[in-house]
Amino acid sequence: YSIAHQISRNENMLDLRIFGLYGPGEDYRYKFISNAIVKALLGLPITIAQNVVFDYLYIADFVRLVEKLLDCDWPYRHMNITPTKSIDLVSLAEIINEVTGNKAGITVLNPGWNTEYTGDNRKLLEVVGPFDFTSYREGIRELAVYYQSVWDSLDLDVVRADPFLDKCIVKR
């Protein structure tokens, strides 16, 4: 709260609220999209603790948005920096399996839906204007190509063991 208050009072500061970010450089051992891509490339099933809807923003879009924001006035000090289309984890896993050709399937461990983690990006689009967000399919395709290019540097044993899965919070 105190940081948000400081940002509100300082015209040189901007609070960009990120709801989900994916792309090269994130920790593939536990970040869902990257972890699922590496699992799919291994031919493993994609395991989801519980389905949930997210606003995942591709890193290249984040960079382009920040560049645009550096070149304009900010009528708002706090903005959600999210894509226009939200997506659930099962749908992401289906796209990942299609893009990678993985036939091992998708497992959801707990029924129901977890708490949605999305935001309204109307203020952002009001400031930067129309923006062409990378589709989830294209972002996943680019990320799969990236992981194939760094394959020998990945700790595949950790991906296979999936020690972070039990750290997921499940809504009962």
What is the meaning of each model-derived region?
Residues 24-30, 51-63, 79-98, 115-117, ...:
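Substrate-binding strand-loop-helix patch
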Residues 66-70, 93-96, 121, 140-147:
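Hydrophobic "lid"/C-terminal helical patch
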Residues 51, 76-79, 90-93, 101-122, ...:
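C-terminal "lid/loop" region of Rossmann-like NAD(P)-dependent oxidoreductases
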Residues 136-172:
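Amphipathic terminal alpha-helices
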Residues 1-17, 40-41:
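Active-site Tyr-X1-5-Lys
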